């Protein structure tokens, strides 16, 4: 994307994962070849050249005769407020980590990459964290992407991992969450909160497949829809 940041490509016959080699050590791309889909497609909100059109007032009609040019017509499908187009302070990627201290403050690990050797199936990153250290390992194993964390000598707090996922379906029956017991609590367009869970499936009928999120130990899961503003 010509942002000047080096990228590390991990790949096999099923999956390609692209990691930004910056302090976040997060994925900017996750390609599933069998589904022909990138789960890490660009979701970071940036300033776009067409946002100035949001200041225009949609007109119900025109006094002039003839058909208005499509380039001059401004109409909004949904109500858009300034906060909807505010640039993101941090990039929206997969496996973006944060550390919530007991005093309520938030710290973000500043990862540094270890040495890499071909063939690239795994990568290791480390970061100091409140007097201790966190190690992050990203590994490909067939159609599975494994991301492991090990915290050493870190004081009390809460470690959170954010996954910004791009899927064809956002709302409606075609995009829904499936729990371990095969029940469907809601669709991608609704908020979902799970306590002490180890598995959640994102089933997308438009995609023709799904994504299974699993954890080695019980975790709290918060899932929310993400809305963007685009010109079409």
Write out the residue ranges for each language-model feature.
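Catalytic core of carbohydrate-active enzymes
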Residues: 18-90
């Amino acid at each position: 994307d010509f942002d000047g940041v080096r990228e590390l490509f991990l790949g096999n016959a099923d999956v390609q994962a692209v990691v930004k080699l910056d302090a976040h050590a997060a994925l900017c791309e996750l390609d599933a070849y069998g589904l022909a889909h990138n789960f890490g497609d660009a979701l970071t909100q940036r300033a776009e050249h067409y946002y100035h059109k949001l200041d225009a007032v949609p007109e119900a009609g025109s006094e002039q005769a003839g058909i208005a040019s499509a380039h001059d017509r401004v109409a909004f499908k949904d109500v858009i407020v300034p906060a909807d187009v505010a640039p993101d302070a941090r990039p929206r990627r997969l496996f973006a980590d944060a550390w919530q201290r007991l005093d309520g403050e938030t710290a973000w690990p500043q990862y540094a990459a270890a040495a890499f050797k071909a063939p690239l199936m795994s990568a290791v990153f480390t970061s100091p964290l409140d007097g201790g250290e966190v190690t992050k390992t990203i590994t490909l194993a067939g159609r599975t992407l494994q991301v492991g964390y090990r915290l050493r000598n870190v004081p009390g707090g809460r470690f959170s991992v954010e996954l910004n996922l791009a899927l064809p379906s956002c709302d409606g029956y075609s995009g829904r969450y499936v729990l371990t017991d095969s029940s469907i609590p809601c669709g991608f367009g609704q908020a979902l909160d799970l306590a002490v869970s180890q598995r959640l499936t994102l089933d997308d009928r438009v995609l023709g497949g799904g994504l299974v999120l699993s954890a080695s130990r019980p975790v709290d899961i918060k899932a929310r829809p993400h809305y963007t503003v685009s010109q079409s």
